Amino acid sequence: MANQLRETHQSLKKKYRELIDGESSLPPEKRNQVNLAQLLMDSRERNKQLAEEVKEVTQRLSETQGDNKLLRMTITKQRLGDDEVGIRHFPAHEREDLVRQLEKAALHREELEHTLKTLSDELQDVKAERTVFKEKSKRLNLELNHILGGQEKRIIDVDALCMENKYLHERLKQVQEEVSLLKSNIQKYKTALDRRKNPEIGGKSSSRSLTGVLSPKQVHGFLSEENGCSLPATPQSISDLKSLATALLETIHEKNIIIQHQRQTNRILGNRVADLERKLKTLEISGLWSLPDDRTGRGGPSLWERDTAGDDSFPNMWRGSRPGPDGGAGEEDTPVTREESDPSGTRTNGQVGTQLKEKKTACCPVTEVIAAVEELCVVLEAEDAVLALDPAGLQLQWTQTPSVTLEQSACKNTDIKNSAGSPATDLGEISEGAAVKIEPIEESGSSFVS
């Protein structure tokens, strides 16, 4: 056993010496490599030891910094005698920044306070003006109601009268334009009639073949392709063709003017309907009126109808006025009297003439106004549909009468409705009773007479 241990010791000693001194059998280069490997291992172990020392030193440094901070806080507490000063303690530069921020915040607060005070003063002024205007409006309504001889429960509203006045002003302007158009048409036809009665005014035109009144069939045959080639190229034919073309252009121009007047009247009536709808919406929102189906479920007359009910001994109400939700007058085209009224909102130049015949009383239900509004909406939709489907056909459509008068406007409602969706009218579709008066441009300045 001892021998074995001795041999093992000798072998290990030999190996250790070979590692330190290098093996004697190896060349010098190999010995240097073995020495470098040993040095590398030693350096790595040394680096590990140094890294552990660095970690330990870093930990000790952090502990020392914490101890210093705690010591400073303790010294500050002992000096100032405040236990919470450590929480609010800041360095000098941070304290300066905080002071500057506080100064800016104080200035901003002063500006906001000044602005708030100014706005409060303006609000008080606006409230005072609103009160003054309310009192003024109330006085005006009372004075107007007293002048018109109305009741105290049914005070006429100034706003409603202004709205009605605006509508009537637009209608008056429209009617004046239509009257001027009718006067020009009458003057033109009067001149043509005088020339027909006095053929010597036209000079040589009375002896020509195409002078006089021609039927639509004759005009169509004259302008047809078959007969067009057989027409002689003479000054007489050229003059007749120019006269016919001028008359047709004048007729088309008149139809265009009629359509423009119709669109303008539609716009006026549309604004009127919008005003009435806003009035009804105001009544519904204020709770003074409900729809005819009695959505409130109470039954019977509404609160507004009960408040405004009374004797009808005041026929001297303002024309077109109606009690509003605040006791004022709403918008209506008929006077509020006990007698049956028959207002006629007739629109000329091919437009619809609506006639509303209703018996109005002091507590007349609002359903009648709704019916009138619905009727106006249907009429406007029909007219817009006609214009959208075939505007060219409406411009070239020929009628028996050369112009539209106030009495004939109501009758043209049926013609306009029947013409929706129909193709454009050509010369072959001219009615039998119509006539065309042909006269040369040079001497007579002829026009198209239908």
Curated annotation (Swiss-Prot):
Stretch list, region Disordered: 290-358
Keywords (A to Z) from UniProt: Coiled coil
InterPro entries: Coiled-coil_dom-contain_pr_149
Keyword check for Coiled coil: yes
Signal peptide positions on this chain: none
Biased composition regions of type Polar residues, renumbered to the chain: 343-354
Coiled coil: 1-197, 259-286
Pfam families: CC149
Keyword Coiled coil: yes
Entry similarity comment: Belongs to the CCDC149 family.
Name used for this protein in its record: Coiled-coil domain-containing protein 149-A
Taxonomic source organism: Danio rerio
Gene that specifies this protein: ccdc149a
